[in-house]
């Protein structure tokens, strides 16, 4: 028997995580331009790139997806199918891991590279997402 859960991620949650994680960077680096609402289109583009990478890695589990980047309702809804009964907290844990992964991917591409603190955090949360999906 397969079990299905839906993961709903609001893009505002991702942007808030980006702003929160990225606030110290301009203070630490005088040449950094900072992430704010004026450069939101760049941030949205980076989030989409990270989401494409993450979805490719999760493709074996995803049975449906509705990615909506419209102005009125900006959210991501993923239907995930698992072979074993999921824990009650799995949808929330996956959402949190994906939000953190996408925020750090965005910051990695804006401020650093794979070896930066953001690159390390991106890999950590990406792995956490996949482990949450594959755990018994």
Name each model feature, range by range.
Residues 96-105, 109:
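Elongated alpha-helical scaffolds
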Residues 1-87, 113, 120, 124-136:
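Conserved short "hinge" loops at termini or chain/domain junctions
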Residues 39-42, 94, 98:
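Conserved acidic
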Residues 84-97:
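Short, mixed-charge amphipathic alpha-helical segments
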Residues 108, 114-115:
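Short coil/turn linking the two alpha-helices of tandem helical-hairpin repeats
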């Amino acid at each position: 028997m397969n079990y299905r859960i839906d993961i709903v991620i609001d893009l505002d949650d991702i942007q808030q995580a980006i702003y929160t994680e990225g606030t110290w960077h301009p203070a630490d680096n005088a040449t950094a331009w900072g992430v704010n609402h004026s450069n939101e289109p760049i941030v949205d583009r980076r989030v989409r790139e990270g989401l494409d990478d993450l979805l490719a890695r999760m493709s074996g589990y995803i049975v449906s997806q509705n990615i909506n980047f419209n102005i009125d309702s900006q959210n991501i809804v993923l239907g995930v199918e698992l072979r074993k009964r999921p824990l009650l907290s799995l949808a929330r844990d996956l959402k949190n891991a994906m939000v953190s992964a996408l925020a750090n991917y965005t910051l990695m591409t804006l401020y650093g590279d794979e070896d930066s603190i953001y690159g390390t955090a991106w890999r950590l949360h990406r792995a956490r997402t996949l482990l949450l999906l594959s755990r018994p």
